[in-house]
Amino acid sequence: MTWKIVTDSGCDLRSLTRQSKELRFERVPLTLQIGTEIFRDDDGLDIDNMMTTMYQSSKATTSSCPSPEAFLQAYRGADNVIVMTITGTLSGSHNSARLAKNELLEENPNVNIHLIDSLSAGGEMDLLVLELERLINLGLSFEEVVKQITAYQQKTRLIFVLAKVDNLVKNGRLSKLVGKVIGLLNIRMVGKASNKGTLELLQKARGQKKAVSALIEEIQKEGYVGGKVYIAHAQNPKICEQISEKIKSLYPDAVIQTGRTSGLCSFYAEDGGLLMGYEI
């Protein structure tokens, strides 16, 4: 039996830990438009160039979800397909993936396919994909993998830290005045993905050190006691080190992985920000 894990670019991972003929990973890119320029969030995207273009532009950046056909092409060629998308509250990607699922089943009624709305993005999606890989490599049945990943999703969370809010201002979600104050006072916005997949602000912290303390406080409130962590960061390895050191000082056995945000997640996190997934 062959497997595919299919995600959109709300997931930061470019590949699995160990790919094989039996298990393949497909990442279906969203696109980002800045003025007249279009950036496809695939492996060839120069994220630094995209971010520079974004900050130089006075216009709002918009994202477009993959077409159902793009998902359908990614689904083909496996007996078992598990699909995961960025939260449906931020993108139409989940709906495109659902339409493609229906088309695939019309083409091939014998294929096993399961679609998951991550209700999240970035680090939490990354954790979920890594767990999917682990479960599949255990040799479990399709039904058992679906059962276990559904249970696992109830035990993962997303927390984010924003160091810049240019996109929120350009998209009209924050006033220019508030945006300037945040920049001048070196304020970090700390928030989370709710259980409905919306992004909620939790705290405002002045400076990175206080933002790390706020993050630790919030994940402990959610029930964190040393589970796995995946930190997806936008050009900020320093905050990854600070968070890792703090978590390790409290929970020495915690397994912490870090990586750079995808183009889409860089757009949401902005320079210096992060989207961290963790287990409770």
Swiss-Prot record:
SUPFAM superfamilies: DAK1/DegV-like (SSF82549). Hexadecanoate binds at S63, S91. Pfam families: DegV. It comes from the Bacteria. GO terms for molecular function: lipid binding. Coiled coil: none annotated. Residues 3-280 form the DegV domain. PANTHER family: DEGV DOMAIN-CONTAINING PROTEIN DR_1986-RELATED, FATTY ACID-BINDING PROTEIN TM_1468. May bind long-chain fatty acids, such as palmitate, and may play a role in lipid transport or fatty acid metabolism. This is DegV domain-containing protein SpyM3_1478.
